[in-house]
């Protein structure tokens, strides 16, 4: 359907009307149907009902209607003047005209020329075509927020292309192939080593400062009697869970990425633990636990650092106390719970979904280890709770950002305010989607054959002997 609009001159102060097929009483429009298949709309002071003229039958001459449409369009193009510019557009077969005139007219108002009569410029000629639904203006009575023809978005600014990342999509570029980037993994591993060393050095310093007072009140300590062997059981479960995680990473197809994330998240958690231990030293949770003697007045910075580095080789566990360095005061928050929870989170995230038994088993081991840790008075209950929340918040926040670049690159991402977010963007800059849960052998069969292949003996002159003589 083609629609043309005539622009009135400045003397009559007429304003071109926005094209609209739907006629409503609010706009006070009269419609006349002519015999030449052209609908003429005239603006009047009131709504008049005029019977329709003769309509062409189905066997009429279609060429005559097309010629009349073309003539009407050419007529409007020749009548534009300097006060208004008519722009003809056509979208999906519908022609429209827009004017740059700045005057506006309210719906229902009618303007007249100097002699009080209607001008010919107030007539809008539109060509009738097949029934078609076009969105009306804001003055239309059918326009509302729930109307079917209401626009979905307001046309207030330039549109922006949005790309939706689908998990099942095939890689669209080489960046989606999960590069190994061992350099980034090495950087994350060094960060973990620095954080672990800082933990032990901080613990060595706290060992000289923690208060020698009775344990703080704890509801679990009051209700349940102490289980002395609970701490050793917790550490055994912790070692088994962490070794299982390392085996999972070893056989994961994207082992470099998983190992890098483990080291980076571990460095964040151990770094925050250094701060919490330092700011609030608390007394021992177990009065019967024997700690190494303090330096006292002979304490120096070098002695404290060397003792912390030496205790790091024991991994902070009581199972490896052959060096006779047992430090106390590392309570807020629990490092044992940190290892148990992080191991369970990584096993559940990167193992196949159908291995639900493994997922339940990992969380069962974590729960049992944490329970016996508290029952043995190895940690306060608040230490375990804070450690769980710290581990889960950091893990879930990191993996949400890493798996969805649209969130990571958004300007409205509030998690970008985290202190570790710039490092996340560098570590995960080449990751465009979630890491798939796929596995393979780290050493291929051909590599094994090449390693154990029989080397041909060489002669005296250095030339290789034939395989068969």
Swiss-Prot record:
GO terms for molecular function: ceramide cholinephosphotransferase activity; sphingomyelin synthase activity. GO terms for cellular component: endoplasmic reticulum membrane; Golgi membrane; plasma membrane. Its EC number is 2.7.8.27. The active site is at residues 336, 379, 383. Residues 40-177 are annotated as: Disordered. Disulfide bonds: none annotated. It is a multi-pass membrane protein. Pathway: Lipid metabolism; sphingolipid metabolism. Its main location: Golgi. Belongs to the sphingomyelin synthase family. This is Phosphatidylcholine:ceramide cholinephosphotransferase 1. It comes from Caenorhabditis elegans. The gene is sms-1.
């Amino acid at each position: 359907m083609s629609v043309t609009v005539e622009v009135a001159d400045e003397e009559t102060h007429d304003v071109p009307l926005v094209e609209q097929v739907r006629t409503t009483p609010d706009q006070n429009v009269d419609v006349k149907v002519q015999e030449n298949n052209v609908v003429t709309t005239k603006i009047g002071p009131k709504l008049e009902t005029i019977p329709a003229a003769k309509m062409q039958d189905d066997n009429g001459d279609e060429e005559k209607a097309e010629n009349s449409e073309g003539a009407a369009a050419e007529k409007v193009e020749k009548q534009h003047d300097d006060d208004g510019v008519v722009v003809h557009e056509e979208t999906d077969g519908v022609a429209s005209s827009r004017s740059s005139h700045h005057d506006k007219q309210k719906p229902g108002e009618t303007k007249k020329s100097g002699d009080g009569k209607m001008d010919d410029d107030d007539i809008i000629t539109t060509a009738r075509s097949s029934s078609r639904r076009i969105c009306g203006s804001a003055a239309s009575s059918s326009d509302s927020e729930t109307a079917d023809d209401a626009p979905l978005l307001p046309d207030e600014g330039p549109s922006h292309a949005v790309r939706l990342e689908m998990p099942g999509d095939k890689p669209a570029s080489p960046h989606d192939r999960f590069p190994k980037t061992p350099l980034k993994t090495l950087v994350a591993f060094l960060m973990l080593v620095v954080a672990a060393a800082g933990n032990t050095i901080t613990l060595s310093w706290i060992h000289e400062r923690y208060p020698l007072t009775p344990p703080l009140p704890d509801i679990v300590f009051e209700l349940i009697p102490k289980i002395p062997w609970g701490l050793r059981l917790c550490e055994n479960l912790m070692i088994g869970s962490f070794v299982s995680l390392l085996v999972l990473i070893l056989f994961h197809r994207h082992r470099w990425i998983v190992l890098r994330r483990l080291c980076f998240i571990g460095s964040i958690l151990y770094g925050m633990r250094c701060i919490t231990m330092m700011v609030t030293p608390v007394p021992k949770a177990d009065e019967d636990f024997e700690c190494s003697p303090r330096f006292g007045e002979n304490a120096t910075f070098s002695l404290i650092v060397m003792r912390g580095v030496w205790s790091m080789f024991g991994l902070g566990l009581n199972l490896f106390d052959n060096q006779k360095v047992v430090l106390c005061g590392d309570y807020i928050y629990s490092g044992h719970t940190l290892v148990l929870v992080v191991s369970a989170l990584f096993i559940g995230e990167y193992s196949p979904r159908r291995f639900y038994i493994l997922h339940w088993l990992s969380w069962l081991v974590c729960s049992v280890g944490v329970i016996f840790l508290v029952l043995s008075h190895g940690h306060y209950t608040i230490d375990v709770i804070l450690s769980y929340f710290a581990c889960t918040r950091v893990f879930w926040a990191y993996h949400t950002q890493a798996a969805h670049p649209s969130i990571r690159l958004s300007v409205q991402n509030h998690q970008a305010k985290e202190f570790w977010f710039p490092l996340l963007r560098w570590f995960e800059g080449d990751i465009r989607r979630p890491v798939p849960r796929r596995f393979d052998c780290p050493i291929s069969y051909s590599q094994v054959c090449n390693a154990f292949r029989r080397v041909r003996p060489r002669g005296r002159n250095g030339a290789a002997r034939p395989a068969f003589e």
